[in-house]
Amino acid sequence: INTFSSNKKIVEILDFLNKNLTNRISIDELADKFYMSRYHLMHTFKEETGCTIGSYITTKRLLFARDMIRDGSSVSAACDACGFGSYSSFIRAYRKQFHSTPTNT
């Protein structure tokens, strides 16, 4: 994930997302907050970062969860702390991202 951007608006959005990773954030809410159309937000974000907003949030959440697990937290605690809707969706996303299970971290 490219987190460097010369676009001030994208830098502000990245900062907001990083501070609110555990909250549910819709594209429409994000667009309203930063006074952009939904299309312009999604297009500009992908152009500047190389990934979609959804994949950015998921990747950051999973990295945070992996750090928690490595620091001794349980898998279920990491799942809850990172804002995943269910344990099974967390495990599925974790396997896809890291090619291993959280217990093998």
Where are these regions (language model features)?
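An amphipathic alpha-helical interaction segment
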Residues: I1-D15, R38-H40
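Alpha-helix N-cap/loop-to-helix boundary motif
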Residues: N2-S5, T22-S26
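A cross-family signal for key residues in well-ordered alpha-helices
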Residues: D15, L63-D67
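Basic/polar phosphate-binding segments, predominantly the helix-turn-helix DNA-binding elements
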Residues: F16-N18, R24-K60, C79-N104
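Flexible coil/turn residues that form the inter-helical turn or adjacent wing/linker of helix-turn-helix
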Residues: N23, D71-S73
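Hydrophobic positions on the alpha-helical face of helix-turn-helix-like DNA-binding modules
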Residues: A65, A78-C79
